């Protein structure tokens, strides 16, 4: 589970079905086997070396998420470690598992926020 609050950013590199993410904030703490939300997508840390870590991604994950679109080297991604029992709940509780696809059809700037209009590909999500 995650709070949805970004803790760090990283630079993305892809080698087939392996993502290599350079961590730009050296205080970001993780261990092999940890769940990390990469742009909101729950992935498992496979390997850590120096200031980067590796995760495996399936073809399905690349097809159904924005990670498949981020093919150029050094694209920035948001990083968030999984929620620990001792952590404060400063955001929301989210799983990081992808349930469906949508397309942003309109972005409107409000006084202190943004309003995104999303067209869902799955009618079951229309109530949201």
Regions found by a protein language model. Name each.
Residues 1-128:
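Conserved loop->alpha-helix
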């Amino acid at each position: 589970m995650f709070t949805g609050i970004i803790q760090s950013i990283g630079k993305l590199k892809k080698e087939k079905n392996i993502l290599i993410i350079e961590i730009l904030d050296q205080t970001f703490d993780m261990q092999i086997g940890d769940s990390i939300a990469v742009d909101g997508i729950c992935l498992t840390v496979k390997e850590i070396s120096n200031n980067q870590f590796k995760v495996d991604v399936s073809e399905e994950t690349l097809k159904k998420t924005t990670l498949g679109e981020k093919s150029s080297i050094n694209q920035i991604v948001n990083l968030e470690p999984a929620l620990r029992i001792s952590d404060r709940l400063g955001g929301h509780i989210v799983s990081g598992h992808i349930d469906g696809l949508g397309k942003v059809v309109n972005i409107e700037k409000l006084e202190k926020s943004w309003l995104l209009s999303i067209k869902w590909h799955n009618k079951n999500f229309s109530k949201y």
